[in-house]
């Protein structure tokens, strides 16, 4: 990930990847295989960590399996962070399914999904439950994976840490 720049002065593991394969799921599974640490951040290149992101994690703690942070669009509005996919109370409007962003204290995890652009996981979770490499970006690979993992693991919202989008993205979710 990130290109072949000289990383000798940093603790970075460059992972070569044939871009013609085009599978985001394969790339993320390769990150898991090559990870040196227990906590792994999965994020697309259009996200950036806030300056106090790491301090927020130190304050939040390490008692989780899967974790999300606040995600902000360029204009400061919420983006797909604490996503609800199929809660009958919120997500169905005249028979159409919709994604909503509830308050951060929402805890009905069986109705949630983790958007594939950014999340944090313990390495053991991803080793036990890798992304389905038969699916790719835009094929609900994140929804399929979320529905497998969320019933089994502790998923928590860290409101002390924040990431921001480097480019404007359409929300496609209703903020409650």
Annotate each language-model stretch with its function.
Residues 1-21:
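Acidic donor-binding segment of Leloir-type glycosyltransferases
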Residues 22, 78-87, 137-138, 164-176:
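Nucleotide-sugar-dependent glycosyltransferase catalytic core
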Residues 137-145:
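Acidic donor-binding loop at a coil-to-helix junction in glycosyltransferase catalytic cores
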């Amino acid at each position: 990930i990130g290109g072949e720049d000289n990383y000798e002065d940093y603790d970075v593991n460059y992972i070569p990847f044939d871009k013609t394969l085009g599978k985001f799921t394969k790339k993320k599974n390769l990150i898991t295989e090559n990870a040196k640490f227990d906590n792994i951040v999965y994020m697309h290149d259009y996200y950036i960590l806030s300056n106090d992101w790491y301090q927020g994690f130190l304050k939040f703690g390490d008692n989780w399996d899967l974790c999300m942070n606040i995600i902000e669009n360029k204009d400061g509005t919420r983006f797909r962070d604490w996503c609800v996919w199929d809660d009958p109370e919120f997500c169905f409007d005249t028979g159409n399914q919709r994604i909503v962003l509830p308050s951060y204290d929402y805890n009905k995890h069986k109705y949630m999904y983790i958007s594939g652009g950014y999340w944090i996981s313990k390495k053991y979770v991803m080793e036990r439950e890798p992304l389905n490499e038969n699916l790719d970006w835009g094929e609900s690979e994140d929804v399929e994976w979320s529905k497998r993992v969320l019933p089994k693991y502790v998923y928590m919202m860290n409101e002390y840490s924040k990431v921001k989008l480097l480019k404007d993205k359409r929300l496609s979710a209703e903020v409650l």
